Every structure is written in structure tokens, then in C-alpha cells.
């Protein structure tokens, strides 16, 4: 998994849309998700404005991050920015964790709908990070599901729209 995450890191950081982005939303990886600490630190070192999700009850906001070592465990035991961290309203790009994806950009998350609610109406470019083994032929979708614009795996960078 770590080797695949490093390959994904390399592909993400070479994307033109990433190099041109000033504000980037990412996520704190847990479990078997694509690991993001290296990606976050790379963005911070490049001088980009980076924010991570913070979940409170049924709402998710993105809050600015300057140092991943200062995150604290949140509602789902996921490292998050502290409550007093400024909210980042708009993003050029958001990197999104995916349990499953299809090549059309349909995504399976954890089933709570936090990302779909947050991304509704967002002008950010949505990039789903996933391992190639998690790409399937089709994902069932509902009217509230938000598609990814790009998918990045250890093998491919796929533009879906």
C-alpha cells in the first residue's frame, strides 16, 4: 500500500491542474486509504493553501492546515484541524478518498454523504484518489452523488469529464 501511495503521490504532484492550483483541499488518510501525509507536506512546502475536512455532527467544513503534526482526532478518529482553525471556503482542487470508483468518476465513499453535500455546487476540480484494484466497471449512483473530474491510481491518471 505504501509503495502504491508513493506512485500516486508522484502522479498527483505532476498534474498541471495541481501545479496551477493555489488552494487545495485534501484529507487525512486512515486505514487502507491512499496515504496523504506526503502529499499534504509537499503542497505546504510548495506554498499552497491546504485545508482538511473537519466533521461536526452532520456537517463537514474544510479548515486550513499549516502543520500536519498539529491535527487532533475528530469525530470518526480521523486526524482533523482544531476547532479554532480558519475555514477555507473555496478550493481550486479537492483530493477525495474513495473506497471504489468507476471510470466515469462515480465514487463510493463511507456512506455518510459528507463529501457529496460539501461538493454540491463547488467549483473545485474533484480528484478521487484510489488504488487500481478499487476501480470497478460501474458504480450505482443516486441523484445526490457527485462525480470525480479526475481519478488517480498508482497506474493511471484518468480524466472523467
Map each language-model feature to its residues.
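Conserved phosphate- and dinucleotide-binding cores of soluble alpha/beta proteins
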Residues: 61-161
Amino acid at each position: 500500500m505504501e509503495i502504491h501511495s508513493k506512485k500516486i503521490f508522484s502522479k498527483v504532484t505532476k498534474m498541471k491542474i495541481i501545479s496551477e492550483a493555489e488552494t487545495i483541499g485534501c484529507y487525512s488518510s486512515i486505514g487502507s486509504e491512499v496515504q496523504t501525509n506526503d502529499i499534504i507536506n509537499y503542497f505546504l512546502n510548495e506554498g499552497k493553501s491546504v485545508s482538511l475536512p473537519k466533521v461536526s455532527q452532520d456537517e463537514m467544513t474544510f479548515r486550513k492546515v499549516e502543520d500536519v503534526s498539529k491535527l487532533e482526532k475528530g469525530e470518526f478518529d480521523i486526524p482533523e484541524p482544531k476547532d479554532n482553525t480558519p475555514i477555507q471556503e473555496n478550493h481550486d482542487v479537492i483530493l477525495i478518498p474513495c473506497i471504489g470508483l468507476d471510470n466515469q468518476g462515480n465514487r463510493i465513499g463511507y456512506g455518510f454523504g459528507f463529501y457529496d453535500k460539501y461538493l454540491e455546487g463547488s467549483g473545485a476540480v474533484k480528484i478521487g484518489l484510489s488504488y487500481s484494484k478499487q476501480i470497478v466497471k460501474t458504480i450505482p449512483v443516486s441523484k445526490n452523488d457527485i462525480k470525480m473530474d479526475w481519478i488517480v491510481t498508482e497506474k493511471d491518471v484518468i480524466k472523467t469529464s
